[in-house]
Amino acid sequence: MSANDRRDRRVRVAVVFGGRSNEHAISCVSAGSILRNLDSRRFDVIAVGITPAGSWVLTDANPDALTITNRELPQVKSGSGTELALPADPRRGGQLVSLPPGAGEVLESVDVVFPVLHGPYGEDGTIQGLLELAGVPYVGAGVLASAVGMDKEFTKKLLAADGLPVGAYAVLRPPRSTLHRQECERLGLPVFVKPARGGSSIGVSRVSSWDQLPAAVARARRHDPKVIVEAAISGRELECGVLEMPDGTLEASTLGEIRVAGVRGREDSFYDFATKYLDDAAELDVPAKVDDQVAEAIRQLAIRAFAAIDCRGLARVDFFLTDDGPVINEINTMPGFTTISMYPRMWAASGVDYPTLLATMIETTLARGVGLH
């Protein structure tokens, strides 16, 4: 559809959420916030949920159903709407078709897909590949950057190859479950043991003695067979949002800081899943209280990191600010969009409110179009 045709009506946006990963519930909560903040005067929004088993369903675009209530996490349930599919055929023009009993009936045609999926089977390049095959414009990073950003090992490798500062780490692939002596000496204690391709701090453990490592690896492997062991970095936890504009230029947001010392009365506390989403225990400072010169250096590093993995659309870049300078922890190509998430909060502090932020992402997607870039 041409830009002139779109000017005559609202842009139809499919917000896709849920999915097969262990971050299903957080994806739902992010989608609820996005549905609440998309400008209905400009966008005709439909909601497509993916169940934990992988079925796609057309659901009511009701953000109130996509919230955490009394610590109960939302979920896309089978039978909650009409099952549908997106044919991998660019000639279909973004058509969503029904599965039996109304086999092949066109339910909706969309201009843009907003894949608000966190974790594997969504944020890792898989749905991006499907959307490329279907010839449908979509918000966010492409296949390569999504896959790299999801994999902590390859994120660090690409950033280091581009001369960007990253922390020390080791990778454990099956059947290996222990570190070599030289790796233990290089990393030191404590270390953080994580699923290599996961987010929301699910499956993450802090290890303060090497005899705790096997249990931490086993815990991480409940979510991913590949495990990354990262040296603990002493420093402030800072974040920066990067946003691509419709003309292709990149902007970096005001910084935010996460402070988790003493959460739930534990000296070894860190920003885990419960702290992030259930306990409301961490303190989030936006804007972060950082020297202007240091803040600008971090913003420039965020833009360099964004470019290093060939990212598009948006990303959140996480840092540790140490006595020796900033260190990049990771890049999140589809950051959280919940009411407490740092990405929209940092942009709000930068003068870009939530509806404008979402509109900019969609405008950038439409300007970019489909195909190789």
Curated annotation (Swiss-Prot):
It is found in: Cytoplasm. Binds 2 magnesium or manganese ions per subunit. Pfam families: Dala_Dala_lig_C, Dala_Dala_lig_N. One of its GO terms (cellular component) is cytosol. NCBIfam families: D_ala_D_alaTIGR, PRK01372.1, PRK01966.1-4. Belongs to the D-alanine--D-alanine ligase family. Residues 156-363 form the ATP-grasp domain. Its cofactor is Mg(2+); Mn(2+). The gene is ddl. HAMAP family: Dala_Dala_lig. Mg(2+) 1 binds at residues 318, 330. GO terms for molecular function: ATP binding; D-alanine-D-alanine ligase activity; metal ion binding. Homodimer. This is D-alanine--D-alanine ligase. Follows an ordered ter-ter mechanism. ATP is the first substrate to bind and is necessary for subsequent binding of D-alanine or DCS. ADP is the final product to dissociate.
